[in-house]
Amino acid sequence: MDCREMDLYEDYQSPFDFDAGVNKSYLYLSPSGNSSPPGSPTLQKFGLLRTDPVPEEGEDVAATISATETLSEEEQEELRRELAKVEEEIQTLSQVLAAKEKHLAEIKRKLGINSLQELKQNIAKGWQDVTATSAYKKTSETLSQAGQKASAAFSSVGSVITKKLEDVKNSPTFKSFEEKVENLKSKVGGTKPAGGDFGEVLNSAANASATTTEPLPEKTQESL
């Protein structure tokens, strides 16, 4: 260390007065989790910010009740009597319910109502409840309208097909073809009054063609 550094070290003065002792106001302990020094303003916890102690598992809930909420001996005794009364009423109602269920089973046995019949009745009642709802009625009406529209569409398609067939039958091409078939029939198998069905004309022409192409019978041995 040279002389210059020695001079700077000697000229340095600490801002703290160590001879005056330690200011105890800066020292504090916080075992409760409070990180603010003594005397500093703290944030009051109200409403949602309030942290109430939560009982641990197995801890008696009564131990967490504050001193202002502690019940007196008379109040505790009254609550115990009320608790015993409620438990007795629950037990009585359970016994009454068991007796009613037994009586109900006996009535069903006498009426011949078995589990299957009861299930059918429940299903029928459930279906009636479903059909009575507005949603089911609306859906049924929608499906009915859709079916009517589909029937009308099929009917219109059939009408269009029938009209197309009639147009084809009345067309000049079809009539010319029908006349040619009739002429062929008249040449092959003779004339037939006009007005016949087109199917009959075709059948007659086919029969006539089969007759003309039938082979001649062979001569018997006697003619020889």
Curated annotation (Swiss-Prot):
Alphabetic keyword roster: Coiled coil, Phosphoprotein
GO cellular component, as recorded: cytoplasm; endoplasmic reticulum; perinuclear region of cytoplasm
Encoding gene (name): TPD52
A GO molecular-function annotation: calcium ion binding
The family this protein is said to belong to: Belongs to the TPD52 family.
Lineage of the organism: Eukaryota, Metazoa, Chordata, Craniata, Vertebrata
InterPro entries documented for this protein: TPD52 (IPR007327)
Region (Disordered): 187-224
Modified residue annotations for Phosphoserine: S36, S40, S176, S223
Ranges of Low complexity composition bias in the record: 203-213
A GO BP entry: secretion
Tissue: Isoform 2 is expressed in colon, breast, prostate, pancreas and kidney tumor cell lines. Isoform 2 is expressed at high levels in kidney, prostate, brain, small intestine and pancreas, at moderate levels in placenta and colon, at low levels in lung, liver and heart, and at very low levels in spleen, thymus, peripheral mononuclear blood cells, testis and ovary.
Protein name per its UniProtKB record: Tumor protein D52
Coiled-coil residue windows: 62-114
Known partners and oligomeric status: Forms a homodimer or heterodimer with other members of the family. All isoforms interact with several 14-3-3 proteins.
A Pfam family annotated for this UniProt entry: TPD52
